[in-house]
């Protein structure tokens, strides 16, 4: 991850294609990013991502969250947010520990290693070059990804994070 900071990950156009976009409840947003987005800049710097928050984006008052940056970092941020909001106590604890970690120091390469979680699912669909993420509360990873490249749709189905080769 330090190489990304030295070289300037924001100079790599591919990191801005297909951003991760999802909606978040206001109370979870305040918990993760702090009141008045106090921790937002720290989270961005420590995760090598750019995070945009659009408050009251949906009629129910949810915040639209857009994350760009290296894929592993985006997935790490999304996993942390998912775990913080989980109904499962163990996942909540893991998510809160991840949140404290990212507030305290930058992610390391070993933090970005993907570890398979049994019984988990994530659904990602692509529309207008934007990746929308829907994570039903009862599903958590195998991963299905569809990206649109120059008019062609490429679908990548991953049944387990162990199948994902970087």
Curated annotation (Swiss-Prot):
Positions of the KH domain: 19-78
Highest taxon of the lineage: Eukaryota
Annotated compartments: Cytoplasm
Induction: By NR4A1/NUR77.
Gene Ontology MF, one: identical protein binding
GO cellular component: cytoplasm
Protein name listed in UniProt: KH homology domain-containing protein 1A
Origin species: Mus musculus
Lineage: Eukaryota, Metazoa, Chordata, Craniata, Vertebrata
Name of the gene encoding the protein in the UniProt record: Khdc1a
């Amino acid at each position: 991850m330090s190489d990304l900071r030295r070289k300037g990950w924001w100079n790599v156009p591919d990191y801005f294609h297909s951003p991760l976009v999802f909606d978040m409840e206001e109370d979870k947003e305040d918990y993760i990013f702090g009141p008045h987005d106090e921790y937002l800049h720290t989270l961005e710097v420590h995760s090598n991502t750019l995070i945009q928050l659009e408050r009251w984006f949906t009629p129910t008052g949810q915040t639209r969250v857009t994350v760009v940056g290296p894929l592993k970092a985006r997935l790490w941020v999304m996993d942390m947010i998912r775990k913080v909001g989980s109904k499962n106590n163990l996942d909540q604890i893991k998510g809160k520990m991840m949140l404290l970690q990212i507030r305290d120091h930058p992610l390391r390469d070993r933090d970005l290693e993907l570890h398979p979680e049994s019984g988990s699912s994530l659904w990602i669909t692509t529309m207008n070059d934007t990746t929308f993420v829907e994570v039903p509360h009862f599903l958590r990873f195998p991963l299905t990804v569809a990206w649109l490249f120059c008019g062609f749709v490429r679908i990548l189905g991953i049944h387990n994070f162990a199948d994902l080769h970087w």
